[in-house]
Amino acid sequence: GDNHDLWVNPKDGNIMVQSNDGGANVSFDGGRTWSSQDVQPTAEFYGVWLDNAFPYNLYMAQQDNSTYIVPSLNAPFNMDAVKTGPGCETGPIIPHPSDRNIIYGNCKGQFYVQNVAAGVTKAYWIGGQSLYGNDGGDLIYRMQRTTPMATSPHDPKVLYYGSQYLHLTRNNGVHWEKISPDLTAFPKCCQGGSGSPITR
């Protein structure tokens, strides 16, 4: 999705490269067939996080695709070594600081916990609501597209999550505490819906 550019080889019009938010696709037959985005190392990432393993792993939220976990020692590149994580394109995706089986993810305000050993991913709405189709003034918690999320450097059980408030969980997102006042100005002029009827 979200196509950006199309390059056509000036010496051979059958060779084309089409770039988009998810990476790039290549055609050698004038656009009749296209390669997968997974066959070349092209991507746009919202952010990259690392774990404490040795060798370490990279946790990445890829625009228009998904979240990925890639070992740092992956040369030559092997797609079979790439794992899918919790959340979606916006991320972030963050490893638990002391439990390598737990990975936190986010998708536009929805929080996820993946237990790698159990093969289970759980999703939670903080405040129990979807952000889609609602005016900002009607939301209990207003999340950014890329919702801030961070583990505590002092306590591995603590995870912070940001809306207009700062939230804290000690049990992988099952229960949340609101630990700050409203940190935004949020003037009345900005409390309506965003976008147009098509994008709402």
Residue positions per predicted region:
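Beta-propeller blade termini and top-face loops
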Residues: 1-200
